[in-house]
Amino acid sequence: ERIWWLARPLYSRPGNDLRTEHYARHMMARLLEDAETPDGFAWGRDRRELLIRFGWPTHWARSLEQRIRLEPPPILGHEPGPSFWLFPAPILTDPWGDVTEVHWQPDKEGPPARYAPPYAAVGFAPIDRVQFARFRLGDSTLTAAAFDLTPDSVFAMRPADVRLAVARDPRTPVLVGRESPATARGVVTVRSAWRPAVLSLEALGRDTSRAARRRAMTAPDPMGLPPALSDILLFAPADVLPGSWEAALSTVLSAPLVHPEKRVGLYWEMFDQPDSTTTVEIAVTRTSSGSKGDPPYSVGRPWCPLTTASPVRLSWREESGSRPRGVGRSVVLDLRSLPRGRYLITVQISVAGRPRGCSSREVRVAAGEER
């Protein structure tokens, strides 16, 4: 059940059409067992296996060339396309493993099976420019997604419905927030009574059969307890720094990408009442995680790496009673001296010298000509 849940093509659409297609292929295989085949070859286990994996042909083609021999011309079946591999990798993870290593590659070459969603006849593309962030609102969680669809050649020019879906487990109904932006950039939010395990930003063309998505697993909270810190939200700094997530979303960056000639703002929330022994430390560390060309991970993680040398580091001590619980903090970092590459920004709070909570986010410092 978990495998089908993670392989569901779009959480924002009702039902799981991939699983329905799988069952339909099994039924079609039963129907074709004793039927004549268009190409004249007998039905067998090999043909059944191909049908289960790749579907049945929707049309056939034959050669019109003149043939001297008496055997009939070859007939070729054509399955629907474009088709995609929608299962995650790895399909199963160890209980102690890092679930954020799970990823999806719909355009995988030579997949074991394929499915062609009818709503993605023009393509099923990744959304690379996304920034997810989660904030506690009392007993619920607000999840926000800032996005930029301009790198997509279709959605940069054609209208799309953008939806943010959050999922907890296979048995809990998915919650969906919708947005129909006038431009290819925007923000969509959704509120849930639980901490999401999967975040999925999905775009569907309004006048074209094209779909796109960015899906990410969220790291479990340490010891299953509510986090002391929210995710870090990157924003473009202005004259006045934001004091709430609503204000931060008004200038949010649509991707964890920092341009070398610009400063970057960090917004987060602390959910414990600080006292005079509470210390906040921010560090920026070079990292080599991720494959070359892959965008930074789109959602923060509730942990910090081991202490290493950081080119940017700052810390301060909170004043007792200076701010109520849950009020946001904002700082502006100048990363213009850093070379291009991938970095990890961490915000860690300590109480009486002991770590109380941490939040980290991957960012990439872009080259000067990159936009």
Regions found by a protein language model. Give the residues of each.
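Residues within mature, well-folded domains
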Residues: E1-R171
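Intrinsically disordered, low-complexity terminal regions enriched in Ser/Thr/Pro/Gly
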Residues: D94-R371
